[in-house]
Amino acid sequence: MKPVSVLLIGLGRVGSRFYEKFRELGESRVRLVGVCEIDERHPLLQRAREGGVRVYENFEEALAPSENPVDIILDTTNIPEVKARIRHRLEETGNHHTVLLPLVASYLLWHMAAPGEDLPENHVQPGY
């Protein structure tokens, strides 16, 4: 089975946990094709670069049409405007392959990646 390619947006508490979990799973299962983080001094960015993960300053750059489209976008910013802009960018580029994970699916992943640990309070608003 081919690995699932994932673009991770945001490396806060939630995004960092997902980053670590995806790396633990290994490239044969999850291919982390990129991370987007506005804090250019975030400690995981250097590790990502060293591990061959592309680092983007913004998701628009990461979503440029490519021969190898991203399977899943995991937006952990919890900012509704970011999700709206991602959806718009996917439409604008005619990308019908990539799935922007709904927030509820992120909850499921969180419970699998961090069993017994509650989501941070600012990550509990419903919505797509």
Give names to the regions the model predicted.
Residues R54-L63:
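Short acidic-hydrophobic, aromatic-tinged amphipathic segments that line or gate anion-handling sites
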Residues E67-I72:
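Short acidic/histidine-rich motifs immediately flanking catalytic phosphotransfer sites
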Residues D75-T77:
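Short, well-ordered coil/turn residues at beta-beta hairpins
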Residues L25-E50:
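NAD(P)-binding Rossmann-fold cofactor-contacting core
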Residues P80-Y128:
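Rossmann-fold NAD(P)-binding glycine/threonine-rich loop
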Residues K2-F22:
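Glycine-rich adenosine-cofactor-binding loop
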Residues G34-I38, V55, I73:
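Short, hydrophobic beta-strand segments that form beta-sheet elements in well-ordered domains
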Residues R49-G52, T93:
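Short, structured coil segments at secondary-structure junctions
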